[in-house]
Amino acid sequence: MKKKAGNLVIGIIFLAGLSLLLYPFVANQWNNYRQKQLISGYEQVVSEKEAAEGIDYDAERKKAEDYNEALLPCVLPDSFALAESSGVDPVYMNTLNIAGDEMMGSVEIPKINIKIPIYHTTEEEVLNKGAGHLEGSSLPVGGPSTHAVISAHRGLPSATLFTDL
């Protein structure tokens, strides 16, 4: 009886150790799958919205460029001070928010094999599920005197994100 109990304890310890060893791999695979699903869902919503009512991409781009121009005289804010502030600019949140889910697009880096969603803001909740755009920096539409800041975690045990950069 003691031998069975000892084998059971050893088996439980082995399974616990194996679980700890496999957790980062399994969690990373799950997050990669989830990010692909989110991006596919975003692209599908945008396609459906475009087919149903049409999306004026020129107007969306103009709105983003106007937002970027309004930032020109400003200094890039301190991201930590921004995180402590209570309000989020509604103009910012509604710009490049075509699907209405706060996702503004995705960033793909083929060399390191990542494709992750970009969300408005850099709050902890956002950075745990993808990349975040720093409010107060230029929106990522290009143009002169624009500097978009896209940030993501690196070194999370549950997701790769920007770990390989």
Residue ranges of model-derived segments:
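Solvent-exposed, non-transmembrane regions of membrane-associated and secreted proteins
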Residues: 3-4, 10-165
